[in-house]
């Protein structure tokens, strides 16, 4: 199985864009050509499963285009997605923000998906995807250290209930890299696929290891790459 994890930043591109005055709200103006480039890149990776972060699922910024469904359609994949904010968050009803989501794309052998929510932070969504031989959790953790620690505790509880081998992937916003993840990984019995601690952020000149693919017992890693 080939897993691709990609924060597409609502397909606004890497240039400077005006930002909404709400933490984590993303960007206001779209860039029509960027989504096509993202689709071509994702297709070139030939993934079996894709975890997408910061996806626009149909706001005015994307011209009403559901980016998760557009990418899934190009791959012939199933898609599941949900707004990344808490169920009672005001962001769930605000224009643009309510269309900001995370998503899984996968071939049609999905057994089920579940949406969980952290108790703290602005970005609270955890997507759980169950396949034949593995359970994958997709996360985007808080920018605040204290909130991240509470979120990691909650994530440990979700992982510990899984009855299949586990993968936990996403943008952890860990400004101290794997050192910040050490206790969570030990408690959950997880290891990083990024054994060389290759940085992933910012994309043009990566300096920080913010993104992780963690795996548990019963899973063998045959390759890892940060494009």
Predicted regions and their residues:
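N-terminal, active-site-proximal structural segment of metallo-dependent hydrolase catalytic domains
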Residues: 1-74, 81-89
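Conserved hydrophobic/aromatic beta-strand scaffold that supports enzyme active sites
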Residues: 5, 102-104, 126-128, 138, ...
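Short, solvent-exposed loop/turn segments at secondary-structure junctions
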Residues: 8-11, 56-58, 86-87, 108-111, ...
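Short aromatic-enriched loop/helix-cap "lid" or pocket-rim segments at secondary-structure transitions
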Residues: 13-19, 64-65, 91-94, 126, ...
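Short, flexible loop segments at the rims of nucleotide/cofactor-binding pockets, characterized by
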Residues: 25-31, 115-117, 142-147
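Structured beta-strand-rich core segments of catalytic domains in phosphoester-bond hydrolases
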Residues: 54-133, 225-227
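Metal-dependent phosphoester-hydrolase catalytic domains
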Residues: 110, 114-117, 130, 147, ...
